[in-house]
Regions:
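Cyclic-nucleotide recognition modules
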Residues: 67-127
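Local beta-strand/beta-hairpin segments that build beta-sheet-rich folds
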Residues: 34, 66-67
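Cyclic nucleotide-binding regulatory module and flanking cytosolic helices
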Residues: 1-30, 75, 79-84
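Short phosphate-coordinating micro-motif centered on Lys-Gly-acidic
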Residues: 33-39
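Short, small/polar residue-rich loop motifs at catalytic or cofactor-binding pockets
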Residues: 20-21, 39-41
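Glycine- and acidic-residue-biased ligand/ion/polar-headgroup-sensing regions
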Residues: 42-55, 71-72
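Polybasic "coupling" helices that flank or enter modular domains
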Residues: 116-146
Length: 148
C-alpha cells in the first residue's frame, strides 16, 4: 500500500490492520453512485484506481461538483472524524474506479491491544485531514481575493 494513510506501518501489519478495520474493496463503473446523501457517514474511502466526484445540490437544485478526488486519495474522512451521522453529499465514480472502504469508527477508536500500527494510522489520518484543511483555507483566501 502506498497511500499516505499507511505510511510508517510495517507491510506485515497491514493485512491484520485491514481485517480489524473491516476493510473491503468494491469496483464502480463510471457515473455509478458510490454513496448517496443520507447514507451513513461512518466510513473512510481510499481510491485505489480511477477517480470520484463529490456532488452537492444547491438551493436551486443545481448539481455542483464540490471536489474531484484522484487515485490514492481519501474521501469521507472529514465526516467520519467529525462524527457526522449522515452524508450531506453524493459520491459518484468520475470514471471506472476501485475503492477500499475502512470502518471509520473502528479506525478512530484504538483497540484493547494498543497496536502500534493503530496509533500510527490515526496520526497519519490527522496529518491528511490537517493538510486538506490548509488547502481549503488557501482556497478560501484565493476566492476572497477574486471578489475584492
Amino acid at each position: 500500500m502506498t497511500n499516505t494513510l499507511f505510511q510508517n506501518i510495517l507491510p506485515e501489519d497491514i493485512p491484520v490492520m485491514l481485517k480489524r478495520l473491516n476493510a473491503y474493496t468494491k469496483f464502480y463503473q463510471k457515473e455509478e453512485y458510490i454513496k448517496h446523501a443520507g447514507d451513513p457517514a461512518d466510513f473512510i474511502g481510499i481510491i485505489e484506481s480511477g477517480s470520484v466526484h463529490i456532488l452537492q445540490d444547491d438551493y436551486y437544485g443545481n448539481r455542483n461538483i464540490t471536489a474531484s478526488i484522484p487515485p490514492d486519495s481519501l474521501f469521507g474522512e472529514a465526516f467520519a472524524c467529525a462524527g457526522i451521522p449522515y452524508l450531506p453529499v453524493d459520491i459518484v465514480a468520475a470514471e471506472d474506479c476501485t475503492v477500499m472502504f475502512l470502518n471509520g469508527k473502528t479506525l478512530l477508536n484504538t483497540c484493547d491491544n494498543s497496536c502500534t500500527f493503530h496509533h500510527t494510522l490515526i496520526r497519519n489520518l490527522l496529518g491528511i485531514v490537517a493538510q486538506k484543511n490548509m488547502y481549503l483555507n488557501q482556497k478560501i483566501k484565493y476566492l476572497s481575493l477574486i471578489h475584492i
